[in-house]
UniProtKB/Swiss-Prot annotation:
GO terms for molecular function: feruloyl esterase activity; metal ion binding. It catalyses: feruloyl-polysaccharide + H2O = ferulate + polysaccharide. Its EC number is 3.1.1.73. It is an enzyme of class 3 (hydrolase). InterPro entries: AB_hydrolase_fold, Tannase/feruloyl_esterase. Residues 1-18 form the signal peptide. The lineage of its organism: Eukaryota, Fungi, Dikarya, Ascomycota, Pezizomycotina. Keywords: Calcium, Carbohydrate metabolism, Disulfide bond, Glycoprotein, Hydrolase, Metal-binding, Polysaccharide degradation, Secreted, Serine esterase, Signal, Xylan degradation. Belongs to the tannase family. This is Probable feruloyl esterase B-2.
Length: 526
């Protein structure tokens, strides 16, 4: 190759290098340009793709000391005052491969943890992304104690503040600004998405809200009420994990085939009403390896029953059957649920010594009457979001061990009744997809790989990815009729055993054949 023929290649390489240098230079100088009210820049740094980013300031309970970053990006770390006595820690990740889209991530549990894996996931897909710590650090609810401003940040203000600041920063960093804004969150993040829809209907064009923790105060009470059913691990009413496996196996035996296929997955728990007398030990049985006592059967029946208040009002629907194995070590472990204990101690009663083992349904009434900053997130009139042209896609794992998927069905019904809209009308802006075989936000026994994060990723195509399906809905008007899930052989990144199209509610999946249950085309939404 002659020197003359090399010139075009050298020119191209120089142009690419110049572009890279320009992006890095812009990032290096960006911190000095940020002059926004209440915003205090901690640092700005360029992070090359492939970096394993260390996170020394991440609280130890948040569980992440590092995060692999897949794309070149400019990282902006800030503190933003939300009142005279509160502030959020906020990060904005601006990728080189920017697609003109803004996105906010959410949080989980009671936590004040920036979800760096969601920042990495969405920035890698070309979104300019923000994530905040919800106004406090760590997974405990103790920072709420006698700090109403911190509770307000947690209830709604952290997300909205991050959106306002993030959109301003995008316009400063990218000359083209942004075209559309999106939200992605699960659990508490799902609740935050719906809180944005209800309170700030213009914040997002598209919201992907998974396993939402709305009906929040009653969820807190529902979660702690399991202890009053199971008792401690020395009680006759308590079931060990091994006993819960006996229960689970029997529930699957009775309900698995209702959908037409014996694949170990319950497609529609609305049709599953297990008869637990079948596994009560026979009189004089010398072993309880494959059976439970009558007292334990009553425990299971109560666990799988709706939760009612002091006046008989439904507070929270039943735990859906099929989640027993995942829930046994968390919800039915012979101890009051830790998040609920924290909420009652540090918010409801402002008493760090409150004894969670003494909880009664009267306490649930006190908590609901309090409902600070309307954290319930249970408003069913979302017409302002509809009129603003917003779209919401919500999904919920049918094996969810922390938040009953029946609660998402209940909210869907409330919206339909409040707004006077049937499924066809709701489809214009609100679509709900129950996901069989999915536990809480990820994991499970079935096809849970729907692309709602790094742990469920199976491609960026809209048909395989709920976030990109939302982008296609917002930007091209093509709404998802199903969301495809992947069943991994051993977690994300391992071979895919099969895929399944999860139906849009209120339709449900039925095996029609021909072919094996692993063939997604052998199933039909009815």
């Amino acid at each position: 190759m002659t020197k003359l023929s090399l010139l075009p290649l050298l020119a191209l390489a120089s142009a690419v290098l110049a572009k890279q240098d320009a992006f890095q230079a812009k990032c290096a100088s960006f911190g000095h340009r940020i002059k926004l009210p209440n915003v205090h820049v901690n640092f700005v740094e360029y992070v090359p793709g492939g970096t394993n980013l260390t996170l020394p300031d991440n609280h130890v309970t948040c569980g992440a000391s590092s995060q692999i970053v897949s794309a070149d990006m400019c990282r902006v770390a800030m503190a933003v005052d939300t009142s005279k006595s509160s502030q959020i820690t906020l990060e904005a990740w601006f990728p080189r491969n920017y697609t003109g889209r803004f996105l906010s991530t959410g949080n989980g549990g009671l936590s004040g943890c920036i979800q760096y894996y969601d920042l990495a996931y969405t920035a890698g897909l070309g979104f300019a992304t923000v994530g905040a710590n919800n106004g406090h650090n760590g997974t405990s609810g103790k920072p709420f104690y006698q700090h109403p401003e911190v509770i307000e940040d947690f209830a709604y203000r952290s997300i909205h503040t991050g959106v306002v600041v993030g959109k301003q920063l995008i316009k400063m960093f990218y000359s083209e600004g942004f075209d559309k804004s999106y939200y992605l969150g699960c659990s508490t993040g799902g609740r935050q998405g719906f809180k944005s829809i209800q309170k700030y209907p213009n914040d997002f064009d598209g919201v992907v809200a998974g396993a939402p923790a709305f009906n929040f105060v009653n969820l807190i009470s529902w979660s702690i009420h399991f202890y009053s059913i199971t008792g401690s691990n020395t009680s006759d009413t308590y079931l060990s994990p091994a006993s819960w496996k006996v229960v689970h196996d029997e529930i699957v035996r009775q309900c698995d085939g209702i959908d037409g296929a014996k694949d170990g997955i319950i497609e529609d728990t609305d049709l599953c009403h297990p008869i637990l007398e079948t596994i009560i030990c026979k009189p004089g049985a010398s072993s309880t390896t494959n059976c439970i006592t009558g007292t334990q059967a009553k425990t299971v029946r109560n666990v799988l029953s709706p939760f009612y208040g002091v006046n008989g009002t439904l507070l929270y629907p039943r735990m859906q059957p099929g989640s027993e194995l995942f829930a046994s070590s968390i919800m039915y472990n012979g101890q009051p649920f830790s998040y609920s204990t924290d909420w009652y101690r540090y918010v409801v009663y402002n008493n760090p010594n409150w004894d969670a083992t003494k909880w009664t349904v009267e306490d649930a009434a006190v908590a609901l009457a309090q409902n600070p900053y309307n954290i319930q997130t249970w408003d069913a009139d979302i017409s302002s979001f509809q009129k603003a042209g917003g779209k919401v896609l919500t999904y919920h794992g049918i094996q969810d061990q922390l938040i009953s998927s029946d609660n998402s069905k209940l909210y869907y019904a409330r919206v339909a009744e409040t707004m006077g809209l049937g499924p066809e009308e709701l489809d214009d802006f609100y679509r709900f997809f129950p996901v069989s075989g999915m536990a809480h936000c990820s994991g499970g026994d079935g096809a849970y790989g729907i692309g709602n994060g790094l742990r469920t990723y199976n491609g960026a195509e809209p048909e395989n990815n709920v976030l990109m399906a939302m982008v296609q809905w917002v930007e091209k008007g093509v709404a998802p009729e199903f969301i495809r899930g992947a069943k991994f052989s051993n977690g994300v990144g391992s071979p895919v055993e099969y895929t399944r199209k999860h139906c849009k509610y209120p339709r449900r999946n039925v095996y029609k054949g021909p072919g094996n249950y692993s063939d997604e085309n052998a199933w039909e939404c009815v």
